């Protein structure tokens, strides 16, 4: 049983007499009343055991739409294969949004299967895949879950590309206009290095440790495409499904406006002092989850997002031309560019600053009114790009000839694969090949790990 606080206890006294003894008397205020009067939301301690997962609904929604665009998934065998394994790719978000994607819980530490679309978050990330246990001294500490990859996969989920580089154009624009020159690890490392002083200043202002801020989202997609192709050529439906299922997550990140922007958590040049503290916060603090989680959840509950998304996928006209893994990475750059054009990150941040102080019951509708329809559009485009990448990898690996379309891959087989850090290994930006025409399915881990023994 999971207990939640329901009141604020202000104090307790005991009244006593010689006949009936002492009787406790406490003064408490119902949390719902207090929060309503103070116009506040209940937020759990960020250091508490994480018993829920943010941000999975959108990824699963895009994954469920994978076989929908039949103008892109032209192979009947591929459509059959996808439909037969769809529940392993992505669960169906219900109206209550009560699907539970956690690997383990304190109540039941037995590892559970996680649908592939959110394995990159819910299994591989160290800040998600853990439970809190007590040590011999009774102190809480994190116990990592099976399959966790520390922070090695985190940079594959984002890429802050919308800052100027070598002139007035953003690095994203340069990648769109001349991918042969800029869409490679060396060029990206040079771009991030040029921003070191700026990144360091922002980190110092917010009291964070310095980091390289390396993002590698399109390169991860390139790698997964090549793994899918190799798996199809080898007649390996398990690896094909594992790689292609986790691919859903990264394509989903690419069509979320804030995942490829330096404004992902707010404008780092616009900060405030946290009330009652010396800590500095972004003025738009909370915008990422406010947009990607709360607004999307509101759309599902109140605006029939699932139905509208399915309709938009079918009616979409985006048809990226993809033959190789390099083409897939270029498609991701194009997807990011179109997404930010339709839903500019700056607009999201500005709107959030405008409405963040109002009640959640008013804030979510305000965000939806501002961005709901456009968000359905970019999610639908993401689903169509995902379908095009799947079809291209299937064709490149002769899936029609090599993969049994009727095979149903078991959850146990998929868990064995995604819990193995050597399968679709998560590597850093400087570990991706310089040659876009190389076989990126051959990427190996360079560092040893106890689990490799």
Question: Where are the predicted features?
Answer:
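Internal, helix-rich recognition cores of eukaryotic regulatory domains
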Residues: 59, 254-255
